[in-house]
A protein has these predicted regions:
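A positional/architectural concept
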Residues: 1-55
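Charge/polar-rich, low-complexity and marginally structured segments
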Residues: 50-157
């Protein structure tokens, strides 16, 4: 079980801190929830304590975050030419909550955006992938948003 003050990652949302643990009554059943305040976006989400193993995880350690940042240039990205298949594949990768998969989605969308204008759905996905990736790396590397953003775009090339 996590505690108040723990830094966690919520797949599809990004990194945040557990502000409180509260009990809510839903359908006459009391359930405990983590109230997570996300670092980017000024958003709070509630995660059922009973589902913590699938809905939140701890922030990656500093060494792993550095490895990902250093390997970003060499990460292989696949570009399906069919928009709907590409979108679905990228969404599935983001849903895993895996930092490397999120980095791959971000990189592939950045590179695709350089080639041609992204659709509205892919622009939104690019923004989400960036928020998720940046929030976790900021915490793991203890760095500022602007510095990390510069480093990420330099690593992509």
């Amino acid at each position: 079980m996590y505690a108040i003050g723990d830094k966690v990652v919520c797949p599809m949302h990004g990194a945040g801190v557990i502000e409180q643990i509260e009990t809510r009554s839903i359908n006459d059943t009391d359930q405990q929830y983590y109230v997570v305040s996300l670092f980017l976006g000024n958003i709070k989400i509630m995660v059922p304590v009973a589902k913590e193993s699938t809905q939140i995880r701890t922030v990656t350690h500093k060494e792993h975050a550095r490895e990902i940042l250093n390997a970003l240039h060499d990460l292989e990205t696949e570009q399906n030419s069919n928009w709907s298949k590409r979108y679905r594949e990228n969404m599935d990768k983001l849903k895993t909550g895996d930092l490397i998969e999120t980095a791959k989605v971000f990189k592939s969308l950045v590179l695709r955006n350089k080639e041609k204008t992204l659709s509205a759905g892919e622009r939104k996905m690019l923004h989400s992938a960036k928020q998720i990736l940046m929030s976790e790396l900021m915490i793991a590397l203890d760095t500022e948003f602007a510095d990390l953003e510069r480093d990420i775009y330099n690593a992509i090339g």
